[in-house]
């Protein structure tokens, strides 16, 4: 297997599979002592991740997504998880890491979605994606991502029944802009807005 990661660079393999690793996603959260950071692991091929893990070792929570489904393991038990059921954007909870999101255009795109949502939250790093997979959040919108920032969350969210694309509806596993959604309906609603910000 090949390996690619923030700390490791790229090491080639022969199986067609690549492990994508980010040992501390959310460095600012880690440094400040907030449990919003995590370890990201993905296994996939050129088409994208098939398995995704978000692990928060400080509070002992692990979220695992595979093509067969998604599971949570934590100090109070374990079990299957899935994304939220359909709700309109005006009832949605939207997360991003930084209020400035990315470029001025990307910030405007995020704000165009956020102003239509019921609740907007900032500063959750990779833990926002875990909350989406577990059914607590409707949308996570980010920009300026590296592939190792998003591949673990993609595998997890797909396993939990959600969708992750770029802001034009294409694949997001190579990094850049990401729109993670709990279900196809709210994804379509947010995507229709974000497509206006190329």
Describe every region a protein language model picked out.
Residues 13-71, 92:
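DPxDG-like acidic metal-binding loop motif
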Residues 6, 55, 143:
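Conserved residues at the C-terminal ends of beta-strands
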Residues 55, 65-66, 78-87:
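Short amphipathic beta-strand/extended segments with alternating polar/hydrophobic composition
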Residues 48, 69-72, 76-78, 101-103, ...:
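Short helix-loop capping/hinge motifs at secondary-structure junctions, enriched
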Residues 82-198:
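An extended, acidic
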Residues 6-7, 22-25, 29, 138, ...:
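Acidic active-site catalytic centers that drive phospho-/nucleotidyl reactions
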Residues 1-24, 163, 185-198:
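N-terminal subdomain of lithium-sensitive/metallo-dependent phosphomonoesterases centered on the IMPase/IPPase/PAP
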Residues 35-37, 58-59, 68, 77, ...:
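A generic "binding-loop/recognition-motif" signal
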């Amino acid at each position: 297997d090949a390996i690619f990661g923030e700390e490791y660079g790229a090491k080639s393999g022969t199986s067609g599979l690549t492990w994508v690793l980010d040992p501390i996603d959310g460095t600012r959260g880690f440094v400040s002592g907030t449990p919003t950071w995590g370890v990201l692991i993905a296994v996939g091929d050129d088409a994208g991740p098939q398995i995704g893990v978000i692990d928060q070792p400080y509070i002992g929570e692990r979220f695992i997504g595979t093509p067969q489904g998604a599971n949570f393991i934590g100090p109070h038990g374990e079990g299957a998880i899935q994304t939220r059921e359909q709700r309109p954007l005006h009832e949605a909870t939207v997360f991003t890491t930084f209020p400035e999101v990315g470029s001025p255009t990307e910030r405007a795109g995020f704000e165009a979605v956020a102003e239509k949502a019921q609740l907007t939250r900032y500063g959750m790093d990779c833990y926002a994606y875990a909350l989406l997979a577990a059914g607590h959040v409707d949308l996570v919108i980010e920009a300026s991502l590296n592939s190792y920032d998003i591949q673990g969350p993609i595998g997890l969210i797909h396993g939990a029944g959600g969708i992750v694309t770029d802001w034009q509806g294409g694949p997001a596993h190579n990094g850049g802009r990401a729109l993670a959604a709990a279900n196809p309906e709210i994804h379509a609603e947010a995507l229709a807005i974000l497509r206006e910000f190329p």
